[in-house]
Amino acid sequence: MAYPFELGFQDATSPIMEELLHFHDHTLMIVFLISSLVLYIISLMLTTKLTHTSTMDAQEVETIWTILPAIILILIALPSLRVLYMMDEINDPSLTVKTMGHQWYWSYEYTDYEDLNFDSYMIPTSELKPGELRLLEVDNRVVLPMELPIRMLISSEDVLHSWAVPSLGLKTDAIPGRLNQATLTSTRPGLYYGQCSEICGSNHSFMPIVLEMVPLKHFENWSSSML
């Protein structure tokens, strides 16, 4: 989860988020090197007294500054496309959960079970227990098995919402009349927090998401108790 004054991303909990972090570091280094080079050239231009007024054209220089940016863009685009296709790939999910956004709460339906569905509301600050997080706790957590591919079907009953869990690398729009899908796989157990990430009205900040990733045996016991 996030911490106060955190400057980086949350710890990756899924293979997709790990790939996103690697791509971020790769792209950030390229941007840093380009910015440093530009600042160095600007500082030289401002401080040097040397001039060159006899140059009418420079084919070699023009060739270099055309080819070099193209190579840099390719070095950014190829890993970006790889991560993009990984995020859209869904192979034989073990479980499917349908998520519906409402003003201002989420409802969940486990489609592999006949009557396993519930609404998830934020717990008001006045009802929080010691150690619970303000504006992030819910009355019904989404319990899911870890280390298994899970398909999330995401839509909305009213306005545009967005279902996002940063530590899993997930952010999918919930659009009325349209069913979007995303895949998540958690590599370790724990509680993972998210929030609606699309402004959806006056209580937009009060519809958090809490995923509880547990071993498969614990999930089976939980699902049996809910039916």
From Swiss-Prot:
Cofactor stoichiometry and binding remark: Binds a dinuclear copper A center per subunit.
TM segment ranges: 15-45, 60-87
Recorded coiled-coil stretches: none
Pfam families (alphabetical): COX2, COX2_TM
Cross-referenced SUPFAM superfamilies: Cupredoxins, Cytochrome c oxidase subunit II-like, transmembrane region
Keyword Nucleotidyltransferase: no
GO MF, any single term: cytochrome-c oxidase activity
UniProt-annotated binding residues for Cu cation A1: 161, 196, 200, 207
Subunit structure: Component of the cytochrome c oxidase (complex IV, CIV), a multisubunit enzyme composed of 14 subunits. The complex is composed of a catalytic core of 3 subunits MT-CO1, MT-CO2 and MT-CO3, encoded in the mitochondrial DNA, and 11 supernumerary subunits COX4I, COX5A, COX5B, COX6A, COX6B, COX6C, COX7A, COX7B, COX7C, COX8 and NDUFA4, which are encoded in the nuclear genome.
Protein name: Cytochrome c oxidase subunit 2
Species assigned in the record: Sciurus carolinensis (Eastern gray squirrel)
Gene (name only): MT-CO2
